[in-house]
Amino acid sequence: LMEARRCKKIYLPFFLCDSVTGACERSGAEIEFYHMDEGLHPVLEERTLPEGEYLYLVNYYGQLTDDKIRKYKKIYGNIIVDHTHAFFQKPLPGVDTLYSCRKFLGVSDGAYLSTDAELEPEKKPLDHSMGRMEHILGRYEYDAGTFYQKMLDNAANYHEMEIRRMSRLTGNLLRTMDYSGIKARREQNYR
């Protein structure tokens, strides 16, 4: 996305996953970190960002409603929304939006991107995820604690990994998932 948008500078929150920071560093874009208020909203000067500059917004706990996202889009112009923790919140037209399958659906890799940018995914290498499945599959036969270190090691590897296309294994697993059932269970657990 950063390549397609020709991103020269990105504003990131201090409270952010290393894999995002690593991807931004590898893109060559200048990074400026910003603080957030107690509601996890950016504390930044309100201004339209020039071409090539983007504000990265993370929807940590559903605090970014559609109306708030539209407000940030109107103020800053160039925004990227990270719905890693709000997987079932629909993307808005004209707003680049990321969703992490790995963090939300229990697969070893993969993400969805909603954008109108012209991408060339075929130029990215295909990921192979079989070797990163042990900690996920092991939890079904043993306890999560047994595979905790493997999960941490797996997550650490993403910081240095280049952007790849989703593995065929992950794509096949995601096609078998009952998304409406998962959403209903998540909402029930929230109550």
Model region roles, listed by residue range:
Residues 89, 93, 103-191:
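Active-site region of PLP-dependent enzymes
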Residues 55, 79, 97-98, 111:
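Short, well-ordered beta-strand core segments
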Residues 82, 102-103:
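Active-site glycine-centered loops adjacent to acidic/histidine catalytic or metal-binding residues
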Residues 50, 97-100:
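Short, hinge-like loop/turn segments at secondary-structure boundaries
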Residues 3-78, 86-87:
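PLP-dependent aminotransferase-like
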